[in-house]
């Protein structure tokens, strides 16, 4: 083709496809994406065309020949595909353009058809949505039919109950019993007859109330289905089924107005509910007499608890010294990090689990099971009808009805077991994950409180809203998100319907009448396993709790009766039902095998936050870290320790140190300390090694305690001992040993055992009774001393001190206690210390005596403990092998250097951030721990020793006076901190410098930041001063999930539905408040009894009860945030550009999901003159028999009709679709009219449920007032 012919063809193209003339193109405010002129620079413009720009830089083209302007480049016809079939990748055909609006998002312009639309024309998502909507409406129609059938069956039950009541009423009036269906006793006893009459009356009232609930459910479902039908019809009526941008903007503005009304209406609802709480409390006070009223007012939820008289209100770590406090803080932070990881994992599992359960399917399954239960109850009612006085025709009708019901129940059970068995299993797994998530949030909140208590003396702070990995989901968008519209805050955290329990109960009811085929194996196993109490669950069938270790003692009298049953329960395998929710198993991180597990009871944590010594725990953590860091051989912890505590505080215990049994009863527990023979971390089975319990370097005493309340006597049993030779080496063969015990302080008497010559395994078996009141006992400490006797000379060689503050008088205990050697206690007369003494005091004394006694010997056979004398422990955990003072500085000096060396090697690897954090957490724990065992074992692996650098200003080391003990080591090299320079040369004496840290140094995030030291760096400052991250600006080309006009219309109708039901709830709450207030003023006992006993009303007021603990309210907020986080996680799994099927299913199921219900008072309370039961006239005795026949025939007819309905659901669905628009005027909410949307909801004005609209015939097109330009977009 020649150039002249090509130019002629280019000149003819605009004439063949004339572009429409744009009007007021300078009013276009949207940012368009189009081919720039530079992209067609190799092709010249056709003759007669020109390029121009408007005031905002938008390029347009002028056709001088036809005197028109257009946005389309005339050269696009040669460079762009001609149709969607020719497009490759993200291309658009000629005539289409993609644009972006800051409020709406992406939209598309069709210049050829002169229209705009929200949908991407390249995707078929709209047709998929329409098919999903049609499928859901069909399923919802089935669900509605189940509800209607349930209504029919319950109506027949009501007729039978009404008939029985009228029959008993006649008997009570006539005192005759010819045709009575009651027992022979009540036929002649007027009192029993009146009791039967009252029961029948109550049964009729209950059935009427249930009928009212079913009616409300049916109306709610019908209204939601009609809304969905109308949405579908409205979208199909549009051209191409799409809204243009003008309508999209108007709908968005309307949604924002509705949201404002919802916010104000929710405030009104909360205020009404708080008023109902006050009225309910007042009615409760009126139900009791004046004496009890005073007691109730004292326990009023509105009273404030005074804590001025309490003495222990300090933080969790204030009673510890500086070193122990920082060690505890480091461990707590490590636990907090592990719980955060566990929460993230649970969120991911829940996000994965949502896709396995269809939205709305649980409600449908519940209706099926409830329908089966109603038919079972109807069958029972029919079986209870007496046939003695019935005619042959009546008997035949009743028996046919029974047979029909039995056949229906058979079919229903078979369908239920095959259809919903897997769904119920998925639902149960989801509930288990939700329970674990709730408990994990509680645990995280507890740890945050502990960290905040530590920050009372330090600059560290933590906030759930500003910390890394926070659950905060605040969005910078002004538009409403999916969670804002479709997630009800009142429904989050609420206990959902236990459909599995309904299924089991219905099966048990039906099995009373007929044996069914075997149930699905999963459900059958769930039925056989019953929940156990938390104190009776064992996670291993071979749990060592079921055996005696060591054999039983005299202290086990009165405690043998329940042992076989308890052991049988302990051997049961755990299931979903009996798994302990309070101790969720946290998966161990790759490099750290000791994840935390803490108790969730607030009282337990606050009362005894340090029930166990942390020294051995730090040793175990050090051993794991040393193995990872390759610093040396594992620490020699000498096997497992003895079972010394049966109810430990699990807050400080890593997972691998916990017993595999969760028993909290006072059976003998077995230590789960790490040893070479422990397989608890691998197989879940832990067997105690008896051969390793008595070690040469471990001295122990077995002590039993029991309190007899009636006699007021404490029974102390000194049973036996192990390895007392480790405390003292006998010089002669006639040495003996005995035990002496006394209650301190102010003990006037003491008790002692017989003297024995066996120091290895002496068996005393002496029991003593000490008269003492319980109040005084809890303030005492039991001190047991080990005394050696050689001839006439006696010497105290060890002691055990037990705080009675934690003794449980309800249980008997038998425990092994470590014995503290006398070498570490300067004077045993001074053991009568206050019960709040800390572990560090004993540690300092132990270190001092260790240096004096062991400076020239290698004897390490002392069996002692640093922190025996503490109030928060019932026993000791560790053996004290205290090192010299300078060794503590050596480990604080050497280990950080090694860690810094590792950090330099791993600084470029992003995957090692968590590992570096664990290493620094370890450094903070090690440098501040007084564990002699740890230091001695580490000393054996050290190759070079350094002097004390003295850069820590806290009390991490023993007092200053003890430094003279180590002057002989001054020739060692001095290693100073790199953050200062000495002002004088280092002399032969040790150079000690104490550094006062600056603000940026002391306020750093303790042991978490993996960065190298930079003074004043942002990472070293407290998180409370960290500036907030700037909000990210929405980019033009972002990965988005496609939205359609159907999505937009569903969002709008969902907002209107929420507003409608909120108005209805406010109206009902106002009416309920008025009635209850009048009853409160008039002191009506009936209404007061209803308010106290009605479960639905109690659940309602519990939502807004100010007596609810702040922790529960905060938990609700965390659950709401977590729900949003789960939704975001699920959205991230959707492929790029793919539609979110699950979210759309949740949208359409929202309209048939019932929200919060407000209870209604019985009609007899509202209208006292009206009788709730319609009594029959007694003019003819034959009417009763006719009614029975009519009832049975009606039941049979209803059952046949229901089966026919199930066969013709498709026809009914089409009929419902055709009649949906005709029903719309009577069923849709007033929120369709935009008039009430813009105004806030007043307190006293509400929209009734069935209130007709005066202007409902107003056409919807008048809702939008726009001037639409087909080329440019829209002028609003």
Swiss-Prot record:
<feature type="compositionally biased region" description="Low complexity">
    <location>
        <begin position="524"/>
        <end position="546"/>
    </location>
</feature>
<dbReference type="GO" id="GO:0006355">
    <property type="term" value="P:regulation of DNA-templated transcription"/>
</dbReference>
<dbReference type="GO" id="GO:0019900">
    <property type="term" value="F:kinase binding"/>
</dbReference>
<feature type="region of interest" description="Disordered">
    <location>
        <begin position="847"/>
        <end position="882"/>
    </location>
</feature>
<feature type="compositionally biased region" description="Low complexity">
    <location>
        <begin position="1"/>
        <end position="16"/>
    </location>
</feature>
<keyword id="KW-0677">Repeat</keyword>
<dbReference type="InterPro" id="IPR000008">
    <property type="entry name" value="C2_dom"/>
</dbReference>
<feature type="coiled-coil region">
    <location>
        <begin position="137"/>
        <end position="219"/>
    </location>
</feature>
<protein>
    <recommendedName>
        <fullName>Protein kibra</fullName>
    </recommendedName>
</protein>
<dbReference type="InterPro" id="IPR051105">
    <property type="entry name" value="WWC/KIBRA_Hippo_Reg"/>
</dbReference>
<dbReference type="GO" id="GO:0005737">
    <property type="term" value="C:cytoplasm"/>
</dbReference>
<dbReference type="GO" id="GO:0035332">
    <property type="term" value="P:positive regulation of hippo signaling"/>
</dbReference>
<feature type="coiled-coil region">
    <location>
        <begin position="266"/>
        <end position="298"/>
    </location>
</feature>
<dbReference type="Pfam" id="PF00168">
    <property type="entry name" value="C2"/>
</dbReference>
<keyword id="KW-0963">Cytoplasm</keyword>
<feature type="region of interest" description="Disordered">
    <location>
        <begin position="521"/>
        <end position="554"/>
    </location>
</feature>
<comment type="subunit">
    <text>Forms a complex with Mer and Ex. Interacts (via domain WW 1) with Ex (via RXPPXY motif). Interacts with Mer, Sav, Hpo and Wts.</text>
</comment>
<feature type="domain" description="C2">
    <location>
        <begin position="697"/>
        <end position="817"/>
    </location>
</feature>
<dbReference type="GO" id="GO:0016477">
    <property type="term" value="P:cell migration"/>
</dbReference>
<dbReference type="InterPro" id="IPR035892">
    <property type="entry name" value="C2_domain_sf"/>
</dbReference>
<keyword id="KW-0175">Coiled coil</keyword>
<feature type="compositionally biased region" description="Low complexity">
    <location>
        <begin position="866"/>
        <end position="878"/>
    </location>
</feature>
<keyword id="KW-0472">Membrane</keyword>
<feature type="domain" description="WW 1">
    <location>
        <begin position="43"/>
        <end position="76"/>
    </location>
</feature>
<feature type="compositionally biased region" description="Acidic residues">
    <location>
        <begin position="906"/>
        <end position="920"/>
    </location>
</feature>
<feature type="coiled-coil region">
    <location>
        <begin position="327"/>
        <end position="455"/>
    </location>
</feature>
<feature type="compositionally biased region" description="Low complexity">
    <location>
        <begin position="847"/>
        <end position="858"/>
    </location>
</feature>
<dbReference type="InterPro" id="IPR001202">
    <property type="entry name" value="WW_dom"/>
</dbReference>
<comment type="function">
    <text>Regulator of the Hippo/SWH (Sav/Wts/Hpo) signaling pathway, a signaling pathway that plays a pivotal role in organ size control and tumor suppression by restricting proliferation and promoting apoptosis. The core of this pathway is composed of a kinase cascade wherein Hippo (Hpo), in complex with its regulatory protein Salvador (Sav), phosphorylates and activates Warts (Wts) in complex with its regulatory protein Mats, which in turn phosphorylates and inactivates the Yorkie (Yki) oncoprotein. Kibra acts synergistically along with Ex and Mer to regulate the Hippo signaling pathway.</text>
</comment>
<dbReference type="GO" id="GO:0046621">
    <property type="term" value="P:negative regulation of organ growth"/>
</dbReference>
<feature type="region of interest" description="Disordered">
    <location>
        <begin position="898"/>
        <end position="921"/>
    </location>
</feature>
<dbReference type="GO" id="GO:0060090">
    <property type="term" value="F:molecular adaptor activity"/>
</dbReference>
<feature type="region of interest" description="Disordered">
    <location>
        <begin position="1"/>
        <end position="47"/>
    </location>
</feature>
<keyword id="KW-0597">Phosphoprotein</keyword>
<dbReference type="GO" id="GO:0016324">
    <property type="term" value="C:apical plasma membrane"/>
</dbReference>
<feature type="compositionally biased region" description="Basic residues">
    <location>
        <begin position="18"/>
        <end position="34"/>
    </location>
</feature>
<dbReference type="InterPro" id="IPR037771">
    <property type="entry name" value="C2_WWC"/>
</dbReference>
<dbReference type="InterPro" id="IPR036020">
    <property type="entry name" value="WW_dom_sf"/>
</dbReference>
<keyword id="KW-0805">Transcription regulation</keyword>
<keyword id="KW-0804">Transcription</keyword>
<keyword id="KW-1003">Cell membrane</keyword>
<feature type="region of interest" description="Disordered">
    <location>
        <begin position="950"/>
        <end position="980"/>
    </location>
</feature>
């Amino acid at each position: 083709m020649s150039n002249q012919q090509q130019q002629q063809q280019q000149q003819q193209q605009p004439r063949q496809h004339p572009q429409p003339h744009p009007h007021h193109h300078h009013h276009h405010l949207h940012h368009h994406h189009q081919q720039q002129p530079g992209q067609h620079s190799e092709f010249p413009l056709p003759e007669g065309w020109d390029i121009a720009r408007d005031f905002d830089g938008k390029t347009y083209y002028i056709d001088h020949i036809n005197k028109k302007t257009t946005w389309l480049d005339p050269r696009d016809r040669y460079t762009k595909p001609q149709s969607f079939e020719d497009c490759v990748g993200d291309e658009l055909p000629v005539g289409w353009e993609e644009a972006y609006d800051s409020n709406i998002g992406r939209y598309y312009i069709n210049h050829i058809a002169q229209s705009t639309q929200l949908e991407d024309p390249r995707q078929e998502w709209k047709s998929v949505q329409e098919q999903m909507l049609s499928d859901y409406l069909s399923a919802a129609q089935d669900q509605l039919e189940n509800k209607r059938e349930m209504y029919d069956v319950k109506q027949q039950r009501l007729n039978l109950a009404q008939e029985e009541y009228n029959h008993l009423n006649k008997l009570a009036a006539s005192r005759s019993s010819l045709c009575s269906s009651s027992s022979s006793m009540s036929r002649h006893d007027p009192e029993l007859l009146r009791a039967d009459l009252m029961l029948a009356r109550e049964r009729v009232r209950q059935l009427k109330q249930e009928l009212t609930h079913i009616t409300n459910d049916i109306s709610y479902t019908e209204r939601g289905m009609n809304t969905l039908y109308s949405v579908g019809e409205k979208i199909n009526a549009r051209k191409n089924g799409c809204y243009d941008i003008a309508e999209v903007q108007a709908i968005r503005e309307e949604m924002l107005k509705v949201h404002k009304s919802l916010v104000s209406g929710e405030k009104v609802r909360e205020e009404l509910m708080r008023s109902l709480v006050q009225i309910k409390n007042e009615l409760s006070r009126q139900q009791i007499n004046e004496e009890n009223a005073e007691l109730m007012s004292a326990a009023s939820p509105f009273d404030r608890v005074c804590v001025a008289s309490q003495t222990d209100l300090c933080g969790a770590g204030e009673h510890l010294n500086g070193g122990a406090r920082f060690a505890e803080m480091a461990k707590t932070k490590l636990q907090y990090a592990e719980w955060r990881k566990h929460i993230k994992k649970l969120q991911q599992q829940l996000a994965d689990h949502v896709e396995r359960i269809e939205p709305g399917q649980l409600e449908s399954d519940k209706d099926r099971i409830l329908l089966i239960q109603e038919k079972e109850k109807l069958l029972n009612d029919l079986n209870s009808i007496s046939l003695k006085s019935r005619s042959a025709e009546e008997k035949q009708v009743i028996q046919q009805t029974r047979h029909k019901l039995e056949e229906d129940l058979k079919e229903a059970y078979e369908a239920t077991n095959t259809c919903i068995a897997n769904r119920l299993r998925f639902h149960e797994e989801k509930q288990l994950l939700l329970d674990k998530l709730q408990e994990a949030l509680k645990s995280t909140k507890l740890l945050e409180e502990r960290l905040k208590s530590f920050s009372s003396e330090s600059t560290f702070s933590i906030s759930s809203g500003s910390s890394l990995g926070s659950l905060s989901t605040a969005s910078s968008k002004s538009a409403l998100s999916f969670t804002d519209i479709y997630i009800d805050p009142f429904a989050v955290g609420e206990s959902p319907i236990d459909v599995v329990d309904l299924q089991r109960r219905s099966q048990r009811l039906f099995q009373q009448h007929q044996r069914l085929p075997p149930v699905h194996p999963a459900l059958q196993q769930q039925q056989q396993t019953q929940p156990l109490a938390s104190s009776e669950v064992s996670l291993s069938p071979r749990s060592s709790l079921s055996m005696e270790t060591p054999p039983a003692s005299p202290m086990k009298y009165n405690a043998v009766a329940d042992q076989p049953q308890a052991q049988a329960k302990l051997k049961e395998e755990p299931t979903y039902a009996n798994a302990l929710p309070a101790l969720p198993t946290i998966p161990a991180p790759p490099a750290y095998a000791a994840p935390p597990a803490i108790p969730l009871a607030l009282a337990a944590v606050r009362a005894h936050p340090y029930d166990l010594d942390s020294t051995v725990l730090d040793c175990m953590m050090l051993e794991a870290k040393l193995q990872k860091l390759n610093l040396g051989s594992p620490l020699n912890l000498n096997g497992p320790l003895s079972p010394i505590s049966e109810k430990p505080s699990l807050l400080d215990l890593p997972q691998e140190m916990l017993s595999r049994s969760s028993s909290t009863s006072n059976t003998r527990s077995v230590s789960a300390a790490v040893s070479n023979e422990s397989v608890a971390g691998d197989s879940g089975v832990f067997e105690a090694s008896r051969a390793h319990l008595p070690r040469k370097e471990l001295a122990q005493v077995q002590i039993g305690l029991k309190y007899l309340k009636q006699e007021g006597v404490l029974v102390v049993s000194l049973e036996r001992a192990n390895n007392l030779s480790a405390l003292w080496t006998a010089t002669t063969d006639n040495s003996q040993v005995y035990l002496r015990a006394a209650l301190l302080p102010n003990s006037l008497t003491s008790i002692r055992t017989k003297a024995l010559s066996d120091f290895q395994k002496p068996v005393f078996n002496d029991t003593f009774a000490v008269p003492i009141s319980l109040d005084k006992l809890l303030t005492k400490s039991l001190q047991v001393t080990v005394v050696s006797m050689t001839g006439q000379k006696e010497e105290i060689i060890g002691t055990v001190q037990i705080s009675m503050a934690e003794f449980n008088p309800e249980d008997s205990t038998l425990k092994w206690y470590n014995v503290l050697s006398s070498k570490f206690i300067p004077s045993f007369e001074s053991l009568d210390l206050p019960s709040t003494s800390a572990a560090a005091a004993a540690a300092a004394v132990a270190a001092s005596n260790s240096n004096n006694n062991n400076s020239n010997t290698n004897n390490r056979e002392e069996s002692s403990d640093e922190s025996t004398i503490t109030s928060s422990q019932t026993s000791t955990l560790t053996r004290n092998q205290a090192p010299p003072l300078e060794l503590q500085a050596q480990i604080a000096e050497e280990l950080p250097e090694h860690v810094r060396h590792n950090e330099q090697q791993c600084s470029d690897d992003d995957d090692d951030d968590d590992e570096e954090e664990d290493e620094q957490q370890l450094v903070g724990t090690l440098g501040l721990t007084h564990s002699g065992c740890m230091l001695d074992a580490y000393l054996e692996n050290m190759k070079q020793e350094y002097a004390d650098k003295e850069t820590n200003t806290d009390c991490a080391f023993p007092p200053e006076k003890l430094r003279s003990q180590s002057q002989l080591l001054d020739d060692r090299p001095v290693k100073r901190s790199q953050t200062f320079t000495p002002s004088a040369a280092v002399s032969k004496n040790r150079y000690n410098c104490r550094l006062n840290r600056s603000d940026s140094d002391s306020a750093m995030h303790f042991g978490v930041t993996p960065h190298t030291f930079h003074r004043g760096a942002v990472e070293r400052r407290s998180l409370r001063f960290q500036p907030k991250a700037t909000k990210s600006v929405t980019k033009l080309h972002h990965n988005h999930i496609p939205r359609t006009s159907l999505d937009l219309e569903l969002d709008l109708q969902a907002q209107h539905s929420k507003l409608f039901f909120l108005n209805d709830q406010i109206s009902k709450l106002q009416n309920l408040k008025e009635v209850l207030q009048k009853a409160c003023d008039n002191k009506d006992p009936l209404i007061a009894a209803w308010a106290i006993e009605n479960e639905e009303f109690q659940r309602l007021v519990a939502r807004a009860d100010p007596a609810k603990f702040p922790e529960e309210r905060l938990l609700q907020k965390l659950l709401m945030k977590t729900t949003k986080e789960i939704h975001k996680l699920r959205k991230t799994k959707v492929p790029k550009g793919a539609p979110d099927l699950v979210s759309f299913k949740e949208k359409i199921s929202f309209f048939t999901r019932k929200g919060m219900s407000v209870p209604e008072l019985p009609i007899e309370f509202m209208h006292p003159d009206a009788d709730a039961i319609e009594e029959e006239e007694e003019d003819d005795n034959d009417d009763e028999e006719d009614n029975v026949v009519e009832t049975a025939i009606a039941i049979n007819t209803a059952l046949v009709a229901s089966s026919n309905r199930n066969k013709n659901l498709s026809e009914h669905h089409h009929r419902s679709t055709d009649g949906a628009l005709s029903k719309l005027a009577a069923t849709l909410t007033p929120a369709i009219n935009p008039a009430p949307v813009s105004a806030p909801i007043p307190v006293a004005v509400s929209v009734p449920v069935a209130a007709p609209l005066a202007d409902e015939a107003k056409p919807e097109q008048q809702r939008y007032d726009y001037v639409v330009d087909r080329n440019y977009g829209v002028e609003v």
